[in-house]
Structure formats: C-alpha cells, structure tokens
C-alpha cells in the first residue's frame, strides 16, 4: 500500500467515524436536493516527493491528465473561458459551474491574469528564491463582487526553497484549500499543484522537494457513503505511481505542455466508482 493510499483510507475512516454533518449547505445535486456532507476540519499531510511519495491513490482511477490540463488552463492560458478548456484540452466538466456567459466568472485563470500572479511569482523567485513572500492567492474579494461564480477551493499556494547537503536547490510547496470533496477531488487537486510545483522547479532548474497539503473542510457528501465504505475495503495496488515531467531543466514555464507529463506505474484498482456531483 502506498503512502497516499494509507492517508486516503485514514481520512475516509476519520470522516465516517468522527465527522459531523453540515447544515444549510450551499451545493445542490442535479435533482435540486441540498447536498449536505459529513466533514472534519483541519486536515494536513506532508508528501516527500523526493522519496517518491506522490498524492495519488491507487484505490480508484483518477483522471490526472485531465487535472493537469485544467491546471494549465488556469495558470498558462489564464482564462475562465469554458470554450478554451473544452476545445483546446477536451475537458468539459467545468460547464456545470458556468455563469451563462461562456465563463466561470472572474475566477481562477481570470484572477491569475488580472493580477499577473504567475508573472509576479516567477519574477519574485528569480530575484530571491529565499524570500518568504512567494505566494499565489486566488482569494480576491474584488473579483467575487465583480461577477457570480464558484469561489476558489484551492486558493493559496506558498513556495519555499532549501539547499540540501548535495548542493541542490529543492522547491517545496504548500497548498491551502478551503473545501475538498474527499472521494472525488482530493487527489485531483493535490496532483494538480504537484504538477505546478514541478513546472516551476523545471523553470529554474531546481529539484522538487516536499508538498504540504492543508484542507480546512474535508468532506464526504451524504450520497457517497456506500462508495466510501467500498474504498476502505479495497486492496490497494502494489505499484508505487509517480509523476514525471519529461522536459530539460530550464524549460520555460509557459512552454510546458500536458503531454510532457508522464504518470509511471499507475495501475489503479477497478472498477471505477460513480459519483453524483454537488454543484
């Protein structure tokens, strides 16, 4: 069992055993019913990528390539236009959160572009990688007031470097997420930001270090308990999957493509489970 599988099972069991139920929840299922959830607060885990600890479960198939395409839509294309996500990358699931004008509102990629977030981050890391102010923050109240739209779930990422005894510089990343659907989105979000960490490390010819993941509200929706129990019972794959970025050191952040990523030794347990999303 991988480290990620162990953490996944522990989190599921913790929510089932110790979680509490939400009240007056905002999300709805497709039939209009309120999507309440059972949740715990303050979930934190460290993945040492140097040791091959990647945050991807083998207990069910996870669409990592689609997740990376979504990440590039946000941080490379820097847009919230659904047509770009759907036509350029073939990713269509964000349509559920459209606001009627072909976008998801002044959110995510549109926020990245408005404040030149990636440009400022790369510039800051280039000038002084040891600066403790190298931060991405998508939580912008001005944007929330400008349009409707889903507020960012994974909203803040902090980057730090450290020089190890081997003389190499390692890039660490800390992802802070306000809310996370444990069964559906947990490993998608985590692997997206590991991919972002890898892209930035390649840009500067650094090594990838540790990935710290904090979720404020970690939940299982009230129509997912059967799937949760199934996942706890499953026997994990004996493989140790890892994500590889096949580009030379020093490759420009904006020149990296989805196909440059390779998921190695990923043999998840099947069949896939079905989930009705809360919107």
UniProtKB/Swiss-Prot annotation:
It catalyses: dUMP + (6R)-5,10-methylene-5,6,7,8-tetrahydrofolate = 7,8-dihydrofolate + dTMP. Pathway: Pyrimidine metabolism; dTTP biosynthesis. The keyword Transferase applies. Its main location: cytoplasm. Its EC number is 2.1.1.45. SUPFAM superfamilies: Thymidylate synthase/dCMP hydroxymethylase. DUMP binds at residues 132-133, 178-181, 189, 219-221. The active site is at residue 153. One of its GO terms (cellular component) is cytosol. Transmembrane segments: none annotated. It is an enzyme of class 2 (transferase). (6R)-5,10-methylene-5,6,7,8-tetrahydrofolate binds at residues 181, 278. Keywords: Cytoplasm, Methyltransferase, Nucleotide biosynthesis, Transferase. It comes from the Bacteria. InterPro entries: Thymidate_synth/dCMP_Mease, Thymidate_synth/dCMP_Mease_dom, Thymidate_synth/dCMP_Mease_sf, Thymidylate_synthase, Thymidylate_synthase_AS. One of its GO terms (biological process) is methylation. PANTHER family: THYMIDYLATE SYNTHASE 1. Homodimer. Belongs to the thymidylate synthase family. Bacterial-type ThyA subfamily. This is Thymidylate synthase.
